[in-house]
Every structure is written in C-alpha cells, then in structure tokens.
UniProtKB/Swiss-Prot annotation:
Pfam families xrefs: PsbI (PF02532)
Cellular compartments annotated: Cellular thylakoid membrane
Keyword Glycoprotein on entry: no
Function statement: One of the components of the core complex of photosystem II (PSII), required for its stability and/or assembly. PSII is a light-driven water:plastoquinone oxidoreductase that uses light energy to abstract electrons from H(2)O, generating O(2) and a proton gradient subsequently used for ATP formation. It consists of a core antenna complex that captures photons, and an electron transfer chain that converts photonic excitation into a charge separation.
Residue stretches spanning the membrane: 6-26
PANTHER family: PHOTOSYSTEM II REACTION CENTER PROTEIN I (PTHR35772:SF1)
Name the UniProt record assigns to this protein: Photosystem II reaction center protein I
Family named by the database record: Belongs to the PsbI family.
Species whose genome carries this gene: Cyanothece sp. (strain PCC 7425 / ATCC 29141)
Main location: membrane
Signal peptide: none
Membrane topology: Single-pass membrane protein
InterPro entries documented for this protein: PSII_PsbI, PSII_PsbI_sf
Keyword annotations: Membrane, Photosynthesis, Photosystem II, Reaction center, Thylakoid, Transmembrane, Transmembrane helix
C-alpha cells in the first residue's frame, strides 16, 4: 500500500512539473496554438 501511495505522489509531481515547465516556456511566439485555446 505504501508503494502505491509513493507512485501516486511521483506521478502527481511529474505532471505538476510538466505543467509548470510548459507554462514558463510556452510563449506565444513559439507556441501559437496556446492562444487559440484561451
């Protein structure tokens, strides 16, 4: 049960890091599709 909890925390942290890095490096000049989603 502890292994499952640790795995869940790792996956959540991984997705949070992906979101933060994508948000910081996703400027409109390099990612024009982001503006269409807003």
């Amino acid at each position: 049960m502890e292994t499952l909890k640790i795995t869940v925390y790792i996956v959540i942290t991984f997705f949070v890091l992906l979101f933060v890095f994508g948000f910081l490096s996703g400027d409109p000049s390099r990612n024009p599709k982001r503006k269409d989603l807003e």
